Amino acid sequence: MTGVPVSRIRNFSIIAHIDHGKSTLADRLLQETGTVSAREMRPQLLDSMELERERGITIKLQAARMNYRAQDGQDYVLNLIDTPGHVDFTYEVSRSLAACEGALLVVDASQGVEAQTLANVYLALENNLEIIPVINKIDLPGAEPERVIAEIEQVIGLDCSGAILASAKVGIGIQEILEAVVQRVPPPRDTVAEPLRALIFDSYYDAYRGVIVYVRIMDGEVKTGDKICFMASGREYEITELGVMRPNQEPVDALHAGEVGYMAAAIKSVEHARVGDTITLVNRKAPEPLPGYKEAKPMVFCGLFPSSSDQYAELKEALEKLKLNDAALYFEPEISSAMGFGFRCGFLGLLHMEVVQERLEREYNLDLVITAPTVVYQVTLNNGSVIRVDNPSKLPPPNERTSIEEPIVRVEVILPEEFVGTVMELCETKRGTFKDMKYLAQGRTTLVYELPLAEVVTDFFDQLKSRTRGYASMDYQMIGYRADDLVRLDILINGDVVDSLSTIVHRDKAFYVGRSLVAKLRELIPRHQFEVPIQAAIGSKVIARETIPALRKNVLAKCYGGDVTRKRKLLEKQKEGKKRMKAVGTVDVPQEAFMAVLKLQND
């Protein structure tokens, strides 16, 4: 033990929208408390992944322990638990907030409250955290701290009389923030005597020690060598190492209630140590686990195929390695008639999907082909059983099912009021249902719509940004499933269904999507020696067709004059050959055609 009583421990996190300066603020706090020497300091110290620093987002959680001597002369231990700010990782945010007693709400003085900040603030309020508003970037010429404070009070309803004006970049207000954490964030409850309960708020895989679990000890204490049990999975392990993060790991002998640290116990996979699970001792089990544990369910699926088949084994190995660190990633082998061998992968959301794809391409040098993202549909069969369908080609035929339900999300958009019209129009075209609209301070508005997730996953975000010149921010939450008139649109090339091009669309949009798809494919598929029909069909009913004409060789070139029957014979022979070729010939569908389908769905 570090010799600090529980009453002098403070656990807090930082809530902020992307780019509002959360990581820079964390850096300043580490410097101010002397946790990191000037020599070790580098920007965004807690964002350890190269991709995180480049995109400026925090994906995996980090934690750091700081020793701070306050103005009252006492030594305090401050545990900063970093949170990812992005909507796909809401569950991870909620777990890291559950590990704290307080939170700094960081808002950019020139931007104001954004949608994702709101979502995370609500999570913090659900966990009864003490929230300290911090208005960051007040050194910017466009900073309007008074407007932003008024907006926070109006939108969130927080009392901002004690809001701290700061600039993490220049170092203004850092001392005040540390003092506010000491004075306003309540200390953890002193429950050392109770049975051990530790909340896992993050875990990652280490090649030498197995899975390293980041925990907040809620009740009791734990020592190196103790036998522990994970309450959700029931697995038992022996602790090989305990320690605290200053951001680098430092081993200690024991951790007590209120402390934040890490433990290693030769755990083989991150799946066995799920975020939100409760750890307790084998010989003195806690009567019940900590509340709030949920299995992470993938919401968006897509096919990943290596562009050359000899990379299949490498792709499999790369996915397995990513899975060690990312329990929410799901994948299973898939065979496609057009693309060969690959994997069907499931993700939490769009950003999660992009990050995984980018990491596969960047860290493992893979060249990937990605099919259009789809969502999970619930299909009720004639016998009353319900199945989940994540791949359009697996949808049962119409005579075997009674209904298809699609996932619906509640989307909250915060935007300047002059763009309200175009954004409402966008939501209407995406089959949205209008729910609510509020005017905020200074000409900003929140819109709330219910939209099918399938319409959001393709390109809703990009279109939203382009229609509002980048000023809108959005956040979405799953609210459940709803039945609708959905059909599977198949693409037939030369009479054969190409499974990778099948999509599930709303019946009202099927004709439009089918027509534009076949027109696009006609441009991309090269001409063959025989004519190739491209059809879009719902079941057996063809709703759109284009034909690629055959390449024609002039068989009469060698006939000079001569009898017409001779020419006719050659033409008939060519016609017969074409017929035979059409019956046995295969159509080569180039890679660009599949990419075009993705782009088309985004238009």
From Swiss-Prot:
Membrane-spanning residues: none
Residue ranges constituting the tr-type G domain according to the UniProt record: 7-189
Cell membrane is among the record's keywords: yes
Record keywords, A-Z: Cell inner membrane, Cell membrane, GTP-binding, Hydrolase, Membrane, Nucleotide-binding, Protein biosynthesis
Signal sequence annotation: none
GO MF: GTP binding; GTPase activity; ribosome binding
InterPro entries documented for this protein: EF-4 (IPR006297), EFG_III/V (IPR035647), EFG_V-like (IPR000640), EFTu-like_2 (IPR004161), G_TR_CS (IPR031157), GUFP (IPR027518), LepA_C_sf (IPR038363), LepA_CTD (IPR013842)
Membrane topology: Peripheral membrane protein
Entry's family note: Belongs to the TRAFAC class translation factor GTPase superfamily. Classic translation factor GTPase family. LepA subfamily.
Function, in words: Required for accurate and efficient protein synthesis under certain stress conditions. May act as a fidelity factor of the translation reaction, by catalyzing a one-codon backward translocation of tRNAs on improperly translocated ribosomes. Back-translocation proceeds from a post-translocation (POST) complex to a pre-translocation (PRE) complex, thus giving elongation factor G a second chance to translocate the tRNAs correctly. Binds to ribosomes in a GTP-dependent manner.
Name recorded for this polypeptide: Elongation factor 4
